[in-house]
Amino acid sequence: MARLKEFYRDTVMKQLMEKFQYSNVMEVPRITKITLNMGLGEAVGDKKIIEHAVSDMTAIAGQKPVVTKARKSIAGFKIRDDYPIGCMVTLRREAMYEFLDRLVNVALPRVRDFRGLNPKGFDGRGNYNMGIKEQIIFPEVDYDKIDALRGMNISITTTAKNDEEARALLSAFSFPFKH
């Protein structure tokens, strides 16, 4: 079992039960999924970019991403229907907890000039979104093999009812929020 999953079950649930006075353990918020999304607008000119992004994302997430395609043609962006314009991967269960562990304890401390995560990333319904500017903060990505620095969006979906509960949940997992 993943280290953070055990930590959640043994420690975080008890903390949140006391803090929010839940009457049932099923009321305690939990993380349901983590979605990684990499938008690749520059892939319009070069199809190799998608392959590199997919290999980076596979190394980071531990599972193969889905290539996202344009839904409709937009002449201003030089894209047509079904052009590959990004890739995404959804992590659940064990893989999700493993990724969360690596994100908080390994990747975020490697970000240059890191001052904490923006507390405004909550959406009002208990979910958190954050952006990463470079994929090289993950140790799984080989620095010598990357062709360009690419960022990604990380979406953490929880069962929390509001931002306060979600923030308490993520803080319990030692997310480094700015004050």
Swiss-Prot record:
Single Gene Ontology BP annotation: translation
Domain of life according to the entry: Bacteria
Transmembrane segments annotated in the record for this chain: none
Gene3D superfamilies given in the database record: 3.30.1440.10
GO cellular component terms listed in the entry, alphabetical order: ribonucleoprotein complex; ribosome
Pfam families: Ribosomal_L5, Ribosomal_L5_C
Record's keyword terms, sorted: Ribonucleoprotein, Ribosomal protein, RNA-binding, rRNA-binding, tRNA-binding
Nucleus as UniProt keyword: no
Function noted in UniProt: This is one of the proteins that bind and probably mediate the attachment of the 5S RNA into the large ribosomal subunit, where it forms part of the central protuberance. In the 70S ribosome it contacts protein S13 of the 30S subunit (bridge B1b), connecting the 2 subunits; this bridge is implicated in subunit movement. Contacts the P site tRNA; the 5S rRNA and some of its associated proteins might help stabilize positioning of ribosome-bound tRNAs.
Family membership: Belongs to the universal ribosomal protein uL5 family.
Name of the protein in its database record: Large ribosomal subunit protein uL5
Organism field: Thioalkalivibrio sulfidiphilus (strain HL-EbGR7)
